Amino acid sequence: MSTKIAIICSKAFMKRIISIAQNITDIQLEFYLYSHPSEAPTLMKQIKPCDAILFGGTLPYLHTQSLLSEVPIPWNYIKQDETTISTTLLSLVAKHAVAIDRISIDVMNPAFVDNVLAEIEFHGQKPYVQHISITEPTENILKRHIALWNSKNIDFVITSIHSVFDELQALQIPSMRMLDATKSIIQCLEETKSKSLLTKSEAFKAVVGLLEIPKDCSIGSTVLSQITKATFSTFK
């Protein structure tokens, strides 16, 4: 039986995950799309019966974090880490030949950028890093990118927010989305599937019990059959 996973994500991420998910057996994906990550809590209320929930990024996960304690099924999210940053920077340098110090990049944790640059022993001028927080409107991040572009301090923008990317494209500012490594997405899908299977196996663990019936009390086979049916058990 396949594992049904509800995925809360953007339209762009849906296209990417569909192309990757075919490498994983016995999963069924159902998408709930947002224009902005802040819409994730509303989408949570629309989810149909499924085996697990997957958020297409850290932002939609953070917006729904307070609701997850009430969710009876496993959940997971695509995490932004050093692998994501390094994959994106490598793609940028290879395809666009833009200098690191001419980039504005928005990330969940600025330390990830520092860690990647330290790992490759980069000692030059660092990129302009914009910290993403759910307490700050994404419009502010967009404005900072635009200001750096208008002042000619940058030649390119890397963004983790799909709505910001769409705005930058409309303004014809050179930009790209953050790239989640294919391997990371596959691992997250496999992990989500495993969590669901584990939850199911825990729910159906066999339990041995003893029902003691007083000698002066007679229970017919019909009553015993009703008890075993209600508890999904057998008796001897």
Each model region followed by its residue ranges:
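N-terminal basic/disordered segments at the start of proteins
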Residues: 1-36
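Extended, charged helical scaffold/adaptor regions
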Residues: 7, 43-44
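Detector for methionine-enriched segments
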Residues: 1, 14, 44, 108, ...
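Short acidic active-site motifs
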Residues: 39-43, 141-144
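Hydrophobic alpha-helical transmembrane segments of multi-pass membrane proteins
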Residues: 29-39, 45, 51-61
